[in-house]
């Protein structure tokens, strides 16, 4: 997994360099490429997304931390939403 992350990072940087070289000095393209490369770089090293903790609002079970489920707040109609509960 670590090798894949490094490979993706290198590919992103190489693609950014290629676009910069082919852009003929157009500043808007450079700005977009730098922003995209920085965004991908930070996403790769930020790690996995954090989970939703107990008694916080949710929409799906996958959002909740381990051993928690996204359950209805009010049993009859669920109009008030859902929260992560054990």
Curated annotation (Swiss-Prot):
Q: Which InterPro entries match?
A: Conotoxin
Q: Where is the signal peptide?
A: 1-23
- Tissues with expression: Expressed by the venom duct.
GO-annotated cellular components:
extracellular region
Q: Which cysteines are joined by disulfide bonds?
A: none
Q: What modifications follow translation? A: Contains 4 disulfide bonds.
Name its cellular compartments: Secreted
Where mainly located?
A: secreted
- Is Secreted included in the keywords of this UniProt record? yes
Recorded hits in Pfam families, A to Z, give: Conotoxin (PF02950)
Q: Propeptide-annotated positions?
A: 24-49
Can you quote the domain comment? The cysteine framework is XV (C-C-CC-C-C-C-C).
Query: According to its UniProt record, which protein family does this protein belong to?
Result: Belongs to the conotoxin O2 superfamily.
Q: What's the protein called, per UniProt?
A: Conotoxin Lt15a
Its source organism is Conus litteratus
